[in-house]
Amino acid sequence: MNKRLLTGLCAVVMLSGLVGCGPKEPKQDTTTSTSTNETKETENNTATTNNSEVTEKNFKDFPETDEKYFTYEEWQEGYAIYGCSSEDKVINVPKTINGKPVIAIAERGLANNQTCEAIVLPDTVRVISKSAFTLDVNLKFIHLGSSLERIGDNAFNGCNSLEFVKFPEGMQEIGINVFANAKVIKYIEIPASVTEIPDVFYFTASNNPDVEIRTPKGSKAEEVANSLGLKVVNN
């Protein structure tokens, strides 16, 4: 079977469920990891650099991470991210690479990062594969973008500094044990558009039992959260 046909079959399987073949494991990245000192002006005209303190208020204002630090491959009409070698405190994924949109984070694509405190995904990303952020132990904040449709199993497994997650309107599917070992998470916002969410999306035995599930009344997320005995706040 030639490489082009194999890649096409793999993409079909990934779309069908984010399991099995899916995006393959990221290639070993031999790029030397360095930090940049780029500066981005915020709305308050204060400079945010990669040396700034990372807060809930400013993490989305950090400079975009240079594409040279990413391992990526073509997938469908754009690119999937398979790895990142940046040691900056914030990984701000670019919207496009080589003129094509970044549309997926592959399996373990941004996992095992020991320095990252926040991740910003562009609005072009539709798919986050399983274990995408696993063991990002210092990750506190994440922005998922407005086009996300599904997130795979164990995506935030071991992210024991993660404070909250807001899934965007239009999101459809949440995988198994997405928040395993997320010990300090305060709240998870889940829109009514999410209709596929398993009873074990949140593993209460190893997570914060006082987490708030913020979701509209009558939603699938409310039903599942109630079955797990989690606190529900209707929004």
PLM regions: where:
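Structural signature of tandem-repeat unit edges
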Residues: 68-76, 86-103, 114-127, 135-150, ...
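Consensus positions within tandem repeat domains that build extended binding/scaffold surfaces
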Residues: 108-109, 130-132, 152-155, 175-178, ...
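C-terminal motif of bacterial Sec signal peptides marking the signal peptidase cleavage site
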Residues: 17-20
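Positively charged n-region of N-terminal signal peptides that target proteins for export
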Residues: 1-5, 23
